[in-house]
Curated annotation (Swiss-Prot):
Name of the protein this chain belongs to: ATP-dependent Clp protease proteolytic subunit 1
Keyword Metal-binding: no
EC category: hydrolase
Domain of life: Bacteria
Species in which this protein is naturally found: Streptomyces coelicolor (strain ATCC BAA-471 / A3(2) / M145)
Amino acid sequence: MRRPGAVVRRAGGYVTNLMPSAAGEPSIGGGLGDQVYNRLLGERIIFLGQPVDDDIANKITAQLLLLASDPDKDIFLYINSPGGSITAGMAIYDTMQYIKNDVVTIAMGLAASMGQFLLSAGTPGKRFALPNAEILIHQPSAGLAGSASDIKIHAERLLHTKRRMAELTSQHTGQTIEQITRDSDRDRWFDAFEAKEYGLIDDVIATAAGMPGGGGTGA
């Protein structure tokens, strides 16, 4: 299911910082403040609600490692993100695989690009989307500048990254690498039910009661 327009235009209206600030710093996230996010963390909920960059990746990896101190309990990662930095996203991805805990992923609103990749990287059987979530896959991109030699090096590295992302997405979805490569060559949009059929998620849920542990909500 394709949608018109590039994802960068879709991202314009999204809140760009929804994680708690450090103690003593001004609160962020539309006035919600640290208390809300500390309460969520106490319920083992992590929220990715912005483009993926180094700052948010450091916060999320730290939270994953903190919650991993109780290795037998699920961690709930809610995702509403237009994507972002591949290297920052890979730090989150590798930490998700590194810890013993099951990481339950839930798409809400938009899970695009690296947001989709992290969604699909959740524990098998525990990857969900809300009914009106949209998911986008596409190939990694980068603006190339500099000398001809530098551009050649960066282009080769980008091709390597594209192959690696396709390999990992294939592992998490059951689709072939060739299929992933074809489908991500241009923006490909999925609604929640199409994402389930493709293997990006395991189920579509409308209420917290339909998820393991109530999605951390106590439902």
